[in-house]
Design a protein with these regions (language model features):
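Extended, hydrophobic alpha-helical segments in both membrane/secreted and soluble proteins
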Residues: 144-148, 305
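Aromatic/hydrophobic pocket-lining residues that form the small-molecule binding cavity
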Residues: 1, 129, 162, 166, ...
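Conserved alpha/beta catalytic core and glycan-binding cleft of carbohydrate-active enzymes
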Residues: 26, 31-66, 170-319
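Short loop/turn motifs at secondary-structure junctions
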Residues: 140-142, 282
Length: 319
């Protein structure tokens, strides 16, 4: 990788890495030690409890464990522990992805597993994050795209603590590693850029707006950017190959209305953050359908979509 970075720099190409800041593998040494006891170096790097917080968590865990591939299930927030420590640990998405403990913005005193953001465990995790960034900056990396950057601090509805966390990282990064770029998978530039990021990305799952433009599962259609010489929109299948339920199809909204809704949303995001950074248009990612899905797969259709992407302030092309 260092050799790749060097050769890229020789050609004037910058290199960014993807940073998954919210979880580790359940095979990671930090987690394996944390799973042994509550008084070890990495014990509070993760969130453990001897009970589930409520009936919903119990129901979710029961449903998840019934699945034959439950380790790949995104149901619920807790996983049953098979380790010497407490009965349950908090997962980020899948059970094999235990959530790192960045703390709770508003910890509930009745939930002893909820630590404040300035308690020793969360503070140590923040330092580890800085150490990881410093390591790769030292190898010549020019910046990072941060996975689910808004999700690190728990119970943070007004985003106060996650903004504080990333502002701290930004200040530290600028002081020690100037001229580096931070890009977030956030999907809300008014928060993201205020947190110190240079770039936020328009996501396919944010307020349903991106789907209006690219591919609209709710409307069982190809999105407002699809045009049909015969009028209307062809039906396509959703991300998983299954038809969207008929009772969720909103046939009253026209492609033109969908396009205007997206345009109004996107331009508001751009105009309100113009002096803060960039709100990027993307052609796809690992969670996002490529723009040539379904009927939008001809040169004529793709020219329309790519005209939008390439005209906006910062296009991101997914290869």
């Amino acid at each position: 990788l260092v050799e790749l970075i060097r050769k890229a720099h020789d050609k004037g190409i910058k290199v960014m890495l993807d940073l998954v800041a919210g979880h580790t593998s359940d095979k990671h040494p930090w987690f394996l030690q944390s799973a042994q006891d509550s008084n070890l170096q990495y014990s509070d790097y993760y969130i453990w409890s001897d009970r589930l917080p409520d009936a919903k968590a119990e129901k979710d865990l029961e449903a998840m464990l019934k699945s034959p591939d439950y380790m790949q299930s995104t149901i619920g927030k807790w996983m049953k522990s098979e380790y010497p420590r407490d009965k349950y640990y908090m997962k980020n998405f899948y059970a094999c992805q235990p959530s790192l403990n960045y703390g709770y913005a508003n910890p509930d005193p009745n939930h002893p597993w909820e630590q404040g953001v300035n308690e020793p465990g969360p503070k140590a995790v923040r330092q580890e994050l800085k150490d990881i960034l410093a390591f790769w900056y030292g190898k010549g990396v020019d910046g990072f795209r941060v996975d689910m950057a808004s999700s690190l601090v728990k119970n943070d509805k007004d985003k106060k603590e996650i903004l504080n966390l990333w502002r701290e990282i930004r200040e530290w990064s600028d002081k020690n590693f100037p001229d580096h770029v931070l890009m977030a998978e956030w999907g809300s530039p008014k928060y993201c850029l205020a947190a110190g990021y240079n770039v936020d990305m328009d996501l396919n799952n944010t307020r349903a707006h991106n789907r209006r433009m690219y591919f609209d599962r709710k409307h069982q259609a190809d999105g407002g950017s699809y045009f049909s010489l015969n009028g209307g929109q062809p039906s396509v299948k959703d991300l998983y190959g299954n038809a969207w339920p008929e009772n969720k199809v909103d046939s009253k909204t026209t492609p033109a209305q969908m396009l205007k809704e997206y345009y109004d949303y996107f331009t508001d995001c751009v105009e309100s953050t113009r002096t803060m950074g960039y709100f990027a248009s993307i052609t796809g990612n690992h969670d996002h359908l490529r723009i040539n899905t379904g009927a939008r797969n001809t040169p004529e259709q793709l020219k329309v979509m790519m005209t939008w992407v390439m005209t906006m302030p910062l296009p991101i092309l997914y290869y």
